[in-house]
Amino acid sequence: MEYLIGIQGPDYVLVASDRVAASNIVQMKDDHDKMFKMSEKILLLCVGEAGDTVQFAEYIQKNVQLYKMRNGYELSPTAAANFTRRNLADCLRSRTPYHVNLLLAGYDEHEGPALYYMDYLAALAKAPFAAHGYGAFLTLSILDRYYTPTISRERAVELLRKCLEELQKRFILNLPTFSVRVIDKDGIHNLENIAFPKRDS
């Protein structure tokens, strides 16, 4: 039902998520933010069971911030991804597993931009582009066709829009607006939301 997408460029990561909060077949909100700021240059995108997403993301968020307060420096995106994955794996083997799918995007001064894909079974993979949700089945082929490692920001936004337009055309559910953000050496920046007009009945 939900959709996340991430595209890594040479010096940035572009991410987007839908803004719908739904319960079963009922839409509860159309302005729900599924992105959680871990640190100045790390963003966690989270979809899944309604309670699990917020509880798990905020738990990781507070622990990453606690690490900075204790040590005086922030975790790198790689370290944050492995910390998140370990916590998800530990919970999976407990009585209270979290049913969440994640994208973690960040920028490190030494390693550059990074995008990590994580699913509810705690599988972790570094990827040049990634997507979660049913929409991933419709858009991963577009990303595979048009993505290049040296893609510019303008071309990445065009590619993102192409994916979202395909979603509007082929996906039966209504996902009208998407939050878009970019992470680079200067931090996390909000881009203009991408919105689509409601379909004619």
UniProtKB/Swiss-Prot annotation:
Domain of life: Eukaryota
Pfam families: Proteasome
Keyword set, alphabetical order: Acetylation, Cytoplasm, Nucleus, Proteasome
CDD domains referenced in this protein's UniProt entry, alphabetically: proteasome_beta_type_2
Tissue: Detected in liver (at protein level).
Entry-annotated residues carrying N-acetylmethionine: M1
A single GO BP: proteasomal protein catabolic process
PROSITE patterns attached to this UniProt entry: PROTEASOME_BETA_1, PROTEASOME_BETA_2
Location in the cell: Cytoplasm; Nucleus
Primary subcellular site in the record, as a coarse category: cytoplasm
Family stated for the protein in its record: Belongs to the peptidase T1B family.
Subunit (UniProt): The 26S proteasome consists of a 20S proteasome core and two 19S regulatory subunits. The 20S proteasome core is a barrel-shaped complex made of 28 subunits that are arranged in four stacked rings. The two outer rings are each formed by seven alpha subunits, and the two inner rings are formed by seven beta subunits. The proteolytic activity is exerted by three beta-subunits PSMB5, PSMB6 and PSMB7.
Function comment: Non-catalytic component of the 20S core proteasome complex involved in the proteolytic degradation of most intracellular proteins. This complex plays numerous essential roles within the cell by associating with different regulatory particles. Associated with two 19S regulatory particles, forms the 26S proteasome and thus participates in the ATP-dependent degradation of ubiquitinated proteins.
This protein's name: Proteasome subunit beta type-2
Gene transcribed to yield this protein: Psmb2
